[in-house]
Amino acid sequence: MAAGTMSGEATMDRRLLAAAASGDAASMKQLALDPGVLLGTTPPGNTCLHVSCILEHEEFCRSILTLDQSPALVSAVNKDGETPLLAAVTRGHVSVASILLRYCRDQQLSQVILKQDKRGFNALHHAIRRGHTMLALELIEAEPALSKAVNKNDESPMFIAAMRNITDVCEKLLEIPYSAHSGTCGLNALHAAVRNGNAVIAKRIMELRPWLVRQQNENKFTPMHLAVSEKRIDVLKVLLEHDSSLGYLISPRLLCVAAIVGDVGVARELLKHCPDAPYCDPKGSTCLHIAVLCGHMEYVKFILGSQQLGQLVNMQNSRGETALHLAAKFKKVEMLSALRHRQDMDITVLNSAGKSANWELLHATNPAKPLISMADDISSPPEPSGGLPVHQETL
């Protein structure tokens, strides 16, 4: 028989616990002749229906749902905030979860279906996170309002589906006008689709919720910035085809982000849609400065061969440095050679400290053996108007 606990809750009868653990439906029905016995709980707050769901005893669950106590048992919540439905879904017991879902739907127990556990997850969150696509679609069909919930990490079902790359579920959720799309750390479902390179989901989001493409995460990155930094050219193309003005986003400039990762394909796609895309960060560093600093030789060559970006060769940052200054300062020998071969490169430019690229190079190495001779010998360029070789300029 059930006995009272210190908190006033009914402790589960040992025989009922044994029946639930073994899936013995016949013994459970015999015990159910005492009306209150089925409502007893274990110390974690689990009923016999919770226990049978946890252990995936499908027939035991079906038998309980035929009893008068079934509404109370289906609605019961354990100390983790789980209903039996949540207990089944969380553990990936799809068939048991489907049985409980159909029962709740038929009995119009919407609040049971919508219940969130102590971490804010509902049955749809858990089904998607475990990759159970058919169960997730069944849940959406039975109770579309599941799509509105976010957990304590601000994750919506749509965000989790996009992160898991489950296209069918994402598309179904997008059909629900009020479905949530937020994610952790300020991300949204479009960030997630971009991260996975899922052009199908990205295209659908752009059609139905185009404003998401301009939302920033906690690091101030929009889905556009993520597409560039993750080198997702196919997704970038989808975003730009929908709205080419996205190529002009600032903070940070997209060409500068592409320079950081050194992806020429991304830069080409950007310039294809936005031939005059911004190329300079707030401190005056161009994507050429950045590519040099990051050591991306192919990106440097791309810029040097680009009609749109040819003017960057002599541009100075906030310290008055050209890309050549940086290549010299950090001994980027191959880049020095490539920059030096530009006929329009002005090697006489002085930085804010009055120093030339040659000075930077000579002082970045052993003065007795200047590395400059390794970079197509720019140590003795044509003399500037002052008559002194560049490396002998007054500092």
Q: Which functions belong to the PLM regions below?
A:
Residues 1-395:
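Regulatory and partner-binding modules of innate immune sensors/adaptors
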